[in-house]
Design a protein with these regions (language model features):
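Structural alpha/beta core scaffold segments of enzyme domains
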Residues: 1-182
């Protein structure tokens, strides 16, 4: 079958962000195999329930951490381990997992930080780009750590957040001076 002999018609792609780059591949492969075997046009469309089950969504993460802090709640060091459920294929899992790592500081000056990311191949649908593209997952890790620090020290979580915020004098891990702080 030559490429010019293939015609794909799509009723609608949907809106928003993510899932349109590679999530249709399973359908396309199934149609190609059926068309080649029968030498006839093939049409396939998931119903909504199957679409939800088969196509990937946001990557779910497990984030483990060890954190050191002083009596004021100032974080002295933190070690994150991200476990990312990618599903049966890589899809966009690598950049999603990378972005989660890059957002692990959120708005906080973490002077001594280690982040490892384990991208897990599982027998579930292949997860893909989704709103936030890994950012929300990375942010949740540090926010949860701060909540635990506040609870352990019996402090208001807002106080712990405030003491750890970036300041204009901070130098980021990339070597840039943080200048957009109040």
């Amino acid at each position: 079958l030559k490429m010019h002999e293939v015609r794909v018609e799509v009723r609608r792609m949907g809106g928003a962000f993510g899932g349109k780059e590679s999530q249709g591949n399973a359908l396309a492969i199934a149609c190609a195999i059926a068309a080649k075997a029968t030498k006839k046009t093939c049409k396939m469309r998931y119903d909504r329930d199957d679409d939800i089950i088969i196509t990937g969504k946001r990557h779910d993460f497990r984030i483990d951490y060890d954190v050191g802090f002083n009596e004021d709640g100032k974080i002295l060091g933190i070690k994150f381990k991200h476990y990312v459920r990618c599903g049966w294929s890589q899809d966009l899992s690598l950049p999603v997992a990378d972005r989660a790592m890059l957002h692990s500081d959120n708005a906080y000056n973490l002077e001594d930080v280690s982040i490892t990311s384990h991208r897990l191949k599982t027998n579930t649908q292949s997860n893909t780009a989704f709103r936030g593209f890994g950012g929300p997952q990375g942010i949740i890790g540090i926010e949860r750590a701060i909540d635990h620090i506040a609870s352990h020290l019996n402090l208001d979580p807002i106080e712990v957040r405030t003491i750890n915020f970036y300041r204009s004098s901070n130098i980021l891990s990339e070597g840039f001076k943080y200048v957009f702080c109040n």
